[in-house]
Amino acid sequence: ERLIWDDESVFGPSPNWGDWRNGPGVDARVREVLEAAETLVRDRLAAYGRGAARYGLIHADMRLANLLIDGGDTRLIDFDDCGFGWFMYDFAAGISFMEEHPQVPALREAWLDGYRAVRPLDREDEVEIDSFIMLRRMALLAWTGSHAGTDLARSQAPHFAAGTARLAEAYLA
């Protein structure tokens, strides 16, 4: 059975990776900001909708760690998170754990250019990428709590909640 990657799978009663409120470093200030971001993400994605041009089968973990590059050929691996979600969510998954990196705007433009080479995007698709980045980041905050024993989660734990709050503040502005 394929996973679902939507607001319910991150914020609902049975989230895929646990409750973001249980992530390391989530204090009262972080919780307040992220609860406001959660509300806005839910509202914006409800308005965005799940039409066939926006929602379907996605990889959901298209990070650099899951690309094999051989000369001019690139292959995508690791389909365990593959499931149903918004197509634009794949960009957010692609920048997992590096959402605050200064190269993200350039990566975003390159990804959009590549996407447009295959199929058209409307303005709303591009605008809502920020909602998908916030959705994914909050899912990852939950993941750092539910996967606390992994090296990646341990390396992210000291700063991830505060960084997520910074992203949320920018998203809410």
Which residues fall in each region the model found?
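A cross-family kinase active-site recognition segment
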Residues: E1-E32, A53-Y55
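Phosphate/dinucleotide-binding and metal-coordinating scaffold of catalytic cores
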Residues: F11-N22, F84, Q103, E128-D130, ...
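ATP/Mg2+ or Mg2+-diphosphate-binding catalytic cores
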Residues: R21-G25, R29, L140-A173
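Mechanochemical coupling/switch segment within NTP-driven translocation systems
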Residues: E32-A46
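Hydrophobic packing residues in well-ordered alpha-helices of helical domains and bundles
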Residues: L34, E38, R108, A157-T164
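Active-site acidic catalytic loop and adjacent metal/ATP-binding pocket
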Residues: R42-Y89
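Active-site activation/catalytic loop segments of kinase-like enzymes and analogous catalytic loops
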Residues: F87-P120, R136-L152
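All-alpha amphipathic helical-bundle segments outside canonical DNA-binding/catalytic cores
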Residues: L121-I133
